[in-house]
Amino acid sequence: MIFRGKVEAIGSTDEPIIFERSDLNSAWGTIALQDNAANDSVLENIKFIGGSGGSEYGIQYTSMLSLHNVSNVLLNEIELIDNSIYDDALHLVYCKNINLSNIKIYQSYRDAIDIDLSSNIYLNNLIIKNSGNDAIDLMDSSVLVMSSLLTNSKDKGISSGEGSNTVVYNTKIQNNNIGIAAKDSSTIALIDNLIDSNNLDLSAYSKNWQYANGGNAVFYNSSINRMSIEVSKDSMLAMDSFSKKRYLADDELSSSLIIYKPVDLYNKEIDGLLLDLEKYK
């Protein structure tokens, strides 16, 4: 079901809108918002259960809920459960100013949320459990993640890659294979988070030869286990004094930091919040 116009689909807590399988053995396809005419859409109190993906007019939809080339869209009180066949539960590409609040995603086939080539994506109060791959996968995007729980992913809690800029605030990232991955000229700022009980809490590295550097991670007011971090030579790790005391590895730390107060994360262009790496070099 592809929507090429503005959608206002608003259920209620007692009577949510539900998309589910009519045949338990056969997955349905995708619900997609496509192109600028679908800007300013609102989806609220909706459950998506057992979908997959699809294609139309040469456009491939790799998730059961897809946002393609839209802006100023609100998703609130959404559940996505048990997608199959296609990789993602929720996919955003070529999007801007998207607000996802109070989202629950369980048992995604691969990535729970995949965000590509998008800017100013706000993710607030997410619960993502048991992802088949990553909880959140980012490519060349700017994203703010707040007040969320990302747990039991078979691969990464957050994978920030290919030039992405990401702020993660007040979020629990636990019991994943890798908690945070920063790679390929991406920067991730981690503020007031709990990142623990992952097989590896943080990995910063190069993967794609087209990018000159590895990944960059900046910790503010966070506890991190130095035995659970891997940082390649072309990556950067920096911390404020609170985090530094808990890490105890002075030779790996940047000499200076720009610090943002958590309140400054609200109502801002995300790229404007992030760190200018030239100031560390």
Can you name each region flagged by the protein language model?
Residues 1-281:
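Beta-strand/loop edge motif enriched in small/polar residues
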